[in-house]
Amino acid sequence: MKNKFDTLTVETGVKSKKKYPIYIGKAILNLLDKVIPRNVSVLIVIDSRIARLHRDKITRLIEFLTESRTVNQIIIPGEEDSKSLSVSESLYEKAASLNLDRSSWFIGIGGGVVGDLTGFVAATYMRGANLLHVPTTLLAQVDSSVGGKVAINQSGYKNLVGNFYQPKAVIIDTNFLDTLPIRELRAGLAEVFKYGILCDRELFLTVKSLFEDCEPLNNVSWERYSYLIHKSCEIKADIVSQDEIDTGIRMLLNLGHTFAHALEGATSYNYFKHGEAVMWGLAMSAELSYKLNKLTYKDYQAIAELPELTKVPEVPIQVKDPNIIEELLLRDKKKTGEELTVILPTSIGSAEICKCPATALIKVILES
């Protein structure tokens, strides 16, 4: 019996009209056989946690693919430190030693770190090999695996070296959520909140109800998670189809992220999960928008209460140093002079791109 799955299509590039599918379902790793051609070489980059917790599943997958392909694997820690030139170099060396060429396939099985790293290596190996994402965290499933952003960190800057490189497909198997810690589920839902604030009030309220019901997040049904994943990917795919390289409407997807990146940097990238920092970033964006008379008090309150409602970690005292915050904000890729491009909600369901002085953002962070 074949497992059921949903399919979305991402269209990229107004001129090139490239397309790729997103498959969403439970126990659907067999779809890799449908996507990857026969008689090609495959290098699978696997998050070490996934390799340990899903060893039998990964072993069966590799055996299945090996029947008609040459398959090798490399296991890396799914930590931010792995998004580095040194780890990238080890992947290049592995690929070269296996005589991989441009017809070969790189598959990333893991969270955002593995996806970013694998995508970066695939994009740059021989100027571009085939890429396929199998995201295993909720955050990667609803956000980072879709849209083609690939990058590594360098010189203390997050995602300093990167590009836009689209995968051939994204396969989202919700079975991986069964072993995901509650903290990771909570972090992933921050990005779903983001999509709701951007353009779908009903989605925002649906996610909020998960926390108001006080049901443990690891008891939520896979069907409910599949719905949230589908809605999130649908929204992101629509935005990416209009602006693949982040020069216009796609910038809206940065809602909460200017604040979040500063919070992550101020805590050395080892205190907050990315989604937890985004949760605070959403609240801070709402506060700034309310102070600029762009957001009603009712909607401001609904967004501002998210960190408390979702029980993400508090903002620690070291974030209260204005000099550190200013330095981090001025590293932002969306900076122009002393001004930052920041996304501000104008309601739960809409947002706009604004220019704000760094001092305005610093004040919001210090008062948090």
Swiss-Prot record:
Enzyme Commission code: 4.2.3.4
Biological process (GO), any one: aromatic amino acid family biosynthetic process
Swiss-Prot/TrEMBL catalytic activity: 7-phospho-2-dehydro-3-deoxy-D-arabino-heptonate = 3-dehydroquinate + phosphate
Positions bound to NAD(+): 112-116, 136-137, 149, 158, 176-179
Enzyme class: lyase
Localization, UniProt: Cytoplasm
Swiss-Prot/TrEMBL keywords: Amino-acid biosynthesis, Aromatic amino acid biosynthesis, Cobalt, Cytoplasm, Lyase, Metal-binding, NAD, Nucleotide-binding, Zinc
Cofactor: binding details: Binds 1 divalent metal cation per subunit. Can use either Co(2+) or Zn(2+).
Annotated metabolic or biological route of this protein: Metabolic intermediate biosynthesis; chorismate biosynthesis; chorismate from D-erythrose 4-phosphate and phosphoenolpyruvate: step 2/7
HAMAP family documented for this protein: DHQ_synthase (MF_00110)
Role, per record: Catalyzes the conversion of 3-deoxy-D-arabino-heptulosonate 7-phosphate (DAHP) to dehydroquinate (DHQ).
Protein name: 3-dehydroquinate synthase
